[in-house]
Regions:
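Conserved S-adenosyl-L-methionine
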Residues: 127-137
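A short acidic, Gly/Pro-enriched loop at the edge of an enzyme's catalytic core
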Residues: 49-60
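Conserved class I S-adenosyl-L-methionine
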Residues: 1-5
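Conserved beta-strand signature within the Rossmann-like core of class I S-adenosyl-L-methionine
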Residues: 88-95
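A short glycine-rich, Lys/Arg-flanked "PGG" loop and its adjoining helix->strand segment in the class I
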Residues: 75-87
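Acceptor-substrate binding/catalytic loop of class I
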Residues: 93, 101-116, 139-140
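A short SAM/SAH-binding and catalytic strip from SAM-dependent methyltransferases
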Residues: 59-73
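Class I SAM-dependent methyltransferase SAM/SAH-binding core
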Residues: 8-50
Length: 155
């Protein structure tokens, strides 16, 4: 599993604890250091635009990470993510639900709806959307936020 934008390493630790071979990556040096300490595993510093894997993963986990990609760059980013998967590999994505793109504290935040994601995913990314659902935010300070969760398969 490629944990793309692993952040603190929370999900990588979960997957490793269940016996999966995990490759955690993050674009932030600070988050890489934090994740390495938390999971006891090397974390590669890698920006989304520099993704360079070719058909090596059965799954890519991008939980609330690709929301930091500008909307104008999402098609190309998803092509690179798709390329990292083996044929029939599975991709999980999540984004805050909506249509906004904003900058806060130097970071980009891109929100998506199911229609927008369906268009992007079916736009030459060699992916097929299998399922999507909306979930509530579990953080207490964001009670009104909704998230869109998507599962795709590489063609």
């Amino acid at each position: 599993i490629l944990d793309l934008g692993c952040g603190s390493g929370r999900d990588s630790k979960f997957f490793i604890g269940r016996g999966f071979d995990v490759t955690p990556v993050d674009g932030s040096e600070e988050m890489c250091i934090r994740a390495e300490k938390y999971i006891g595993h090397k974390v590669r510093r890698l920006m989304f635009e520099d993704l360079d894997y070719d058909g090596v993963f059965d799954g890519v986990w991008a939980c609330a990470s690709l929301l930091h990609v500008k909307k104008e760059e999402m098609n190309e980013t998803l092509r690179k993510v798709s390329k990292s998967l083996r044929p029939d590999g599975v991709l999980y994505l999540s984004f805050r639900y909506g249509d906004d793109e904003r900058r806060s504290s130097g970071m980009i935040y891109s929100d998506y709806t199911e229609d927008t994601l369906d268009t992007i995913i079916n736009n030459d990314a060699h992916l097929r959307m299998i399922e999507w659902w909306i979930s509530e935010d579990t953080r207490r300070d964001h009670p009104d936020d909704l998230w869109i969760n998507v599962i795709c398969c590489r063609l």
